[in-house]
Amino acid sequence: MKQLSSAEVRQLFLDFFKEKGHTIEPSAPLVPNNDPTILWINSGVATMKKYFDGSVIPDNPRMANAQKSIRTNDIENVGKTARHHTFFEMLGNFSIGDYFKEGAIVFAWEFLTSPKWIGFDPDKLYVTVYPEDEEAKTLWREKIGLSDDHIVEIEDNFWDIGIGPSGPDSEIFYDRGPAFGDDASDPELYPGGENERYLEIWNLVFSQFNHNPDGTYTPLPKQNIDTGMGLERMVSIIQDAPTNFETDLFMPIIREVEQIAGVKYGHSQENDVAFKVIADHIRTVAFAIGDGALPSNEGRGYILRRLLRRAVRYAKVLTINEPFMYKLVPVVGKIMNSFYPEVENQTDFIQKVIRTEEERFHETLNEGLAILETILKTAKETNEQIIKGADIFKLYDTFGFPVELTEEYAEDHGLKVDHAGFEAEMKEQRDRARSARADVKSMQVQGELLANLTEKSAFVGYNSTEHVSEILYLIQDDTLVEEVAAGSEAQVIFKETPFYAESGGQVADKGTIESETGLAYVEDVQKAPNKQNLHRISVKEGVLKTGDTVKLAVDKVKRRETIKNHTATHLLHRALKDTLGEHVNQAGSLVSPDRLRFDFSHFGQITEEELTKLEEIVNEKIWEQINVVIEEMPIAEAKELGAMALFGEKYGDIVRVVQVGKYSIELCGGVHVRNTADIGLFKIVSETGIGAGTRRIEAVTGKEAYRFVTEQENTLKQAASLLKTTTKETPQKVEQLQADLREVKRENESLLSKLASAASADIFESPEEIGGVKVIAKQVNAKDMNQLRQFVDNWKDKKIGGILVLGAVQGDKVNLISAVSEEAIKAGYHAGKLLKEVATRCGGNGGGRPDMAQAGGKNPAELGTALDYVSTWVKEQQA
């Protein structure tokens, strides 16, 4: 067997399939582009769904890729097994209606066994097949020459993820030999069983059926091939590594952790788990941040935060007690740089994000320790012997506190932990995550009609909004028709069209179609599978027929406003990078006639000063009257110019470059103004955060910007009129009013305090004594909870002692507060427990600390009864 590095294995795979006529697709970013069904790109096929369901026809039906992927459905096993990972690479080859089972099997066998490529011993290879897939069995037996004892039938070998393409699959296994298992009585010791001897290295999926919505299976119009080979597993075999972690993909990271920790790998199982967790998780986090994800409390950001915190917790096993994960980023970048330069190119930014998150987590751990101390203290004060599962889970989930650490502290205080309760909380979280998580979601049922419409249609709308053309196809209800009449809708493909199809964030053009016999409106334009512009129309008059000569007219006003917003979007993109940093990447956009919306990655908030600067930069470029130059050129030449490419987009060899002078250079297929002066004016309407590490700016240009400014000016004039001042002096007038209001509030609070003090004399007079404990339980007049707290403060100041419960009616609600003196707490009384009982008797709930609690109720009529219960409760405590 050859000795190969991981980079060499990856490159050999891609070179092999390139030699076999495949287009090598670039690895897509981990954050899905226009696919809300998944949190992460989690396989090679996840980026190919549009080809498999026929919604897009690829230029070459043969494709291959090395796709970085993230899966997080089994995080707790990472580090504890030989091959669980959250980040991994999937090597795959794909055929869309080209070669099928024979081609896939022959290619796989040649790559694995030929001395030119991997050069495995054929006797070491086994395959599994679906029992009913006689064709695959025959090919393995007769075409490849495998003996029957190397072909294993397994019922699960059928790939089906719901509606859409599905079919049998065939997996290839490598026999690592008796050293990894030779117990003949082991029922799992076979290719496809749970064992370490037979490692699955490649899965060949034969998509030959449509899984229909009614549950039936019908043959696909075009059969497809989808294969997946895990690079980490493949490399572990080639490098003769016991687990994936001893390969050159992980060991440099582990060696760096050894240096930081001063602890050696391979001497302790507990330590080795920590090394593996750290090595796995830093790869995931570094690549995910590089691709635009950021730690947060939701979605993919929550997963990153969880992985970072898990790694930091395991680092404590290695006596690492300070931020360190950020130091591993350059190592990850160096390992992967030959194929994935993005981590090395963004090392500083990725390190900054990780270090900030680590520092916050170390602070959070300290907060968690303070919370735990409170929990332990409360448990002792209330004579509880067990720390509740809900408390353990909160410490674990919110503060990253390991259960074992909580247990150690509990034991030090003579307490036990509720493991069953904790596991129940964990199960609930897993169930929530499972319901929210999506793997490769089902695709659309593969269609045939549009995929078979191959006659080309040219877009001629860059320089013209009117054009005379010919109707090539008319489609109604997924059927080709000869004509469509007034009152009906249809889809149309023309020989040439000036109508822009929605793409790159720019909305589709609208307009009219006129023939000698009919009139129709264009409502929408999208790309058909074979890249023609597909127009959705509604026929208003007469009849349109296939072959008709028609006059196509784009709505010029809407197009004019749209292109202003599109060029302004390019200016804004460049201005964001200049103002906030080069880490800013486009995460989505909308360019319509009335506004533009731009989503982008950014770690942190944007200040008012930065927004002002952005507006100034864009408007300066507008007023400089810069010519917009658009040309097509080879992609290599565009890159030399420094052209910005959209993150996650795929480009051909020839690209369209939009240059706004030397200021902004982007690859773009959209329509633009000829000169920035055409934009007129640019105004930012809003800036918000829309998710973890993603911000959104909405803006307007031209007439809409003028309208926006006018509305703002009118609002200011109205405010000035109400304040009886000028627009210029309005801010000072508002400041004066705010100062006056603060003074009134201070006087009001002082008055309320005096009233509460005066009322306290009556409220606190003659408290009831029950078994030597002073008890006050009364209804009072208090406008809110703040005033009730003032009564409690007065009670404390007067050092009355004992137990206080006060209730006040506020509209249809009840406010309740209770307080217990230090002596009463020592005697076993608890304000929170008392108030919970009182609140339930007037339709509410609540609780709090032993010394003070507050609650609310929904039944004012029962407040008197609830307060009467206080005496009963005190007597019950004394019984």
UniProtKB/Swiss-Prot annotation:
GO terms for molecular function: alanine-tRNA ligase activity; aminoacyl-tRNA deacylase activity; ATP binding; catalytic activity, acting on a protein; transferase activity; tRNA binding; zinc ion binding. It catalyses: tRNA(Ala) + L-alanine + ATP = L-alanyl-tRNA(Ala) + AMP + diphosphate. The keyword Cell inner membrane does not apply. Its main location: cytoplasm. Binds 1 zinc ion per subunit. Keywords: Aminoacyl-tRNA synthetase, ATP-binding, Cytoplasm, Ligase, Metal-binding, Nucleotide-binding, Protein biosynthesis, RNA-binding, tRNA-binding, Zinc. It is found in: Cytoplasm. InterPro entries: aa-tRNA-synth_II/BPL/LPL, Ala-tRNA-lgiase_IIc, Ala-tRNA-ligase_IIc_anticod-bd, Ala-tRNA-synth_IIc_core, Ala-tRNA-synth_IIc_N, Ala-tRNA_ligase, Ala_tRNA_ligase_euk/bac, DHHA1_dom. It comes from the Bacteria. GO terms for cellular component: cytosol. Its EC number is 6.1.1.7. Gene3D superfamilies: 2.40.30.130, 3.10.310.40, 3.30.54.20, 6.10.250.550, Bira Bifunctional Protein, Domain 2 (3.30.930.10), Threonyl-trna Synthetase, Chain A, domain 2 (3.30.980.10). The keyword Signal does not apply. Its cofactor is Zn(2+). Zn(2+) binds at residues 566, 570, 668, 672. GO terms for biological process: alanyl-tRNA aminoacylation. Consists of three domains; the N-terminal catalytic domain, the editing domain and the C-terminal C-Ala domain. The editing domain removes incorrectly charged amino acids, while the C-Ala domain, along with tRNA(Ala), serves as a bridge to cooperatively bring together the editing and aminoacylation centers thus stimulating deacylation of misacylated tRNAs. Belongs to the class-II aminoacyl-tRNA synthetase family. Catalyzes the attachment of alanine to tRNA(Ala) in a two-step reaction: alanine is first activated by ATP to form Ala-AMP and then transferred to the acceptor end of tRNA(Ala). Also edits incorrectly charged Ser-tRNA(Ala) and Gly-tRNA(Ala) via its editing domain. This is Alanine--tRNA ligase. It comes from Listeria monocytogenes serotype 4b (strain F2365).
